[in-house]
């Protein structure tokens, strides 16, 4: 009996050692497994965090780009509006300037034309001499380069002949011209006026043949 007990104790001792070794192996294996699992979890958690960070950065960049675009578009719009507003103003200003220039040029042309016409303008005076002294007034008009249409219907023959001779001599001295245009009418013109009269037959019912003009007799 004592021998069996000792033998059983020895067996149990060796059995406990094996069990302890097995337990130690199991514990070691579990220790090794736990860090690996933790490492795998950590390793798996890190890639998840990196894409999140990338998404956050992308969102931030997109927002910043949108903000810059939103800031740029109003400026572009305002510049377009300013250009559109300024362009019609410039067009109206150009039209107004052209109108002013055209009106001023027209006014200048009118003034120049009026001045030229005034300087070159020739007047025709119609005179009905009644006495010999009226001939001097007619010659004075010729001196200032005026045309004179003379009608001798209110003069007698002798007075009309004397007046006509005086006017004819003055016209030659002043390089004018005296032409008959009617039965009792003569045209006295200065040297700067040319008179072209068509040839026509003037009726000479009561004409004095010697002096070649018709006078009403009183």
From Swiss-Prot:
Disulfide bonds: none annotated. One of its GO terms (cellular component) is cytoplasm. It is found in: Cytoplasm. Pfam families: SepF (PF04472). InterPro entries: Cell_div_SepF (IPR023052), Cell_div_SepF/SepF-rel (IPR007561), SepF-like_sf (IPR038594). Residues 25-115 are annotated as: Disordered. Residues 29-43, 102-115 have a biased composition (Polar residues). Belongs to the SepF family. Homodimer. Interacts with FtsZ. Cell division protein that is part of the divisome complex and is recruited early to the Z-ring. Probably stimulates Z-ring formation, perhaps through the cross-linking of FtsZ protofilaments. Its function overlaps with FtsA. This is Cell division protein SepF. It comes from Streptococcus pyogenes serotype M1.
